[in-house]
A protein has these predicted regions:
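Alpha-helix N-cap/N′ positions at the starts of helices
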Residues: 2-3
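Short, charge-rich amphipathic alpha-helical segments embedded
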Residues: 17-18, 22-47
Length: 47
C-alpha cells in the first residue's frame, strides 16, 4: 500500500489530479481498512 500512496502523491505533485483521484478511489476500494497517516494524506487527498 505504501508504494501505491507514493505513486498517488507523485501524480498530485505533477498536477495530474484526475488520475490521482481515480488511483485514490481504487486504493480505498482495494484497502478499505488501511489508515493513511496524516502527513501522507496531505500529499494524496483530493484537491
Amino acid at each position: 500500500p505504501r508504494a501505491e500512496l507514493e505513486s498517488i502523491a507523485k501524480l498530485r505533485a505533477e498536477g495530474r489530479d484526475a488520475e490521482a483521484d481515480r488511483a485514490l478511489d481504487a486504493f480505498r476500494r482495494d484497502h478499505p481498512g488501511y489508515r493513511i497517516d496524516d502527513a501522507t494524506w496531505e500529499r494524496v487527498k483530493p484537491r
